[in-house]
């Protein structure tokens, strides 16, 4: 069981909303969009959990080529769960993330309140933009 699997199971067991993305793809597209031969393709192994969702992300963790800890099967985190603002933290285990979840007391209720606040703020901004256009 991977670190991401352990974290996903914890989130499910504690009713914390999340979306998980797993992407195992071979890419053969060059920068100019021309299809390359098989010898120039590369493999993208990307796994991500977003809390509560991709669109409204309070925090997320990834394990993909190039992320801090990927080669060791460890997680990289970004967002509200990290110790330093606007930074990523790597080489984390699922247990490291779980301890932070418990420290911040994330729950369905707290995340729902955050999400509602975020959506209301976007609605207010959209209303103000419409007033500016009139």
Model segments located where?
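Intrinsic low-complexity, intrinsically disordered segments enriched in polar/basic residues
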Residues: 1, 13-14, 43, 121-122, ...
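Amphipathic alpha-helical segments
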Residues: 3-17
